[in-house]
Amino acid sequence: MSMSTVPACIEPVAPLAPQAQDLRCFNTLGLASHAPAFVALTEPSQLPALSALAPRFRQLVVLGGGSNVVLPASIDGLVAQVRLPGVRLVGQCADAWVVEAAAGENWHGFVTACVDNGWDGLENLALIPGTVGAAPVQNIGAYGVELADRFHSLTAWDVKGGRWVEMGAAECRFAYRDSFFKHQEPGAWVIGSVRFALPRPWQPVLDYPDLQRHAALDGAAPTARAVYDAVCAIRRAKLPDPAVVGNAGSFFKNPLVDAGTRQALLGRFPGLVSYPQPDGRYKLAAGWLIDQCGWKGRQLGAAGVHDRQALVLVNRGGAQARDIMALAAAIQGDVERRYGVRLEPEPVVVPAR
């Protein structure tokens, strides 16, 4: 793989002093979790210190907003939360704005700032929880747009190599809810900043049925602000607020199947919800599969399935990782027995050791 090393700046190394930390408020599922060793990364100059510190621990767990992780009751290792701040316009040309955001920026806050400044193109990704740095790892997507569609490049810290590396789309190897980073040793990389190429002129992406049905987008030429507002309204109506009900957003990926499998399923289940993909495959609506298995609104111990969106697993109070994963396994089993399709979880499941 071709990557370019960023020349190191000559600056003092900021020290890191690990401390014990309760992580219940550091994950949107609200799971009880404890880190005996925790550090917050607030400036790039701390990354060399992280490289020096990490080998002393069994594992390094890198956290962003904690919106796409399942944390164990106790983590035997070092937990580093990325809080690097900053948003700036770094370039523009005839067909794109290039906007850079530091990894610790709140994702929705960044999208809002782009809309406010007329840097359009990310509005379909509004209200996705988490941070900018976590977004490329998952290749987040919603309502017809993926991060990869707007990606320019990123800068990441190679923890073992002790260097900053510049990576383009080819190096990141984006796929559906997937990237290069998800196939590396956990804690091997810390994303420092991400740059986005936002199209000029802008065209709305309204392929998703919910957006097509939204009254605010009935006009002939909807603005980016109107799309942003519609996405926020739809998400608030369908998805629980993690500040009120602990959840990690969509817990399962929409499974991809070939045309033959989809046709066979349609023969048995005429109401099957599916979406054609550019490569000829079909994406099945995981929420529909789960709902048809009778899981919407059900509870298993302290974990449950949201009553309005079957893709969302929730913490009903006092849940731990084992409760969430037991519920996920039960759902996977029912869906596979009925449809012959295996659902894959979206969140990263952090091992205790």
Swiss-Prot record:
Q: Where is the FAD-binding PCMH-type domain?
A: 31-201
The cofactor(s) it depends on are: FAD
* Example of a GO biological process term: cell division
Subcellular localization(s) per the UniProt record: Cytoplasm
Its pathway, per UniProt, is:
Cell wall biogenesis; peptidoglycan biosynthesis
Name the chemical reaction catalysed here: UDP-N-acetyl-alpha-D-muramate + NADP(+) = UDP-N-acetyl-3-O-(1-carboxyvinyl)-alpha-D-glucosamine + NADPH + H(+)
Q: Which cellular components does GO assign to this protein? A: cytosol
Taxonomically, the superkingdom here is: Bacteria
Query: What does the record give as EC number?
Result: 1.3.1.98
Key words, A-Z: Cell cycle, Cell division, Cell shape, Cell wall biogenesis/degradation, Cytoplasm, FAD, Flavoprotein, NADP, Oxidoreductase, Peptidoglycan synthesis
The answer on whether this UniProt entry bears the keyword Lipid biosynthesis reads: no
Q: Where is the active site?
A: 177, 250 (proton donor), 346
Is Protease found in the keyword set? no
Q: Which GO terms describe its molecular function?
A: FAD binding; UDP-N-acetylmuramate dehydrogenase activity
Main localization is cytoplasm
Q: Which family does it belong to?
A: Belongs to the MurB family.
Functional summary from the UniProt entry? Cell wall formation.
Which HAMAP family does UniProt cross-reference here? MurB
Q: Which named protein is this? A: UDP-N-acetylenolpyruvoylglucosamine reductase
What organism does the UniProt record list as the source? Answer: Bordetella parapertussis (strain 12822 / ATCC BAA-587 / NCTC 13253)
Protein encoded by which gene: murB
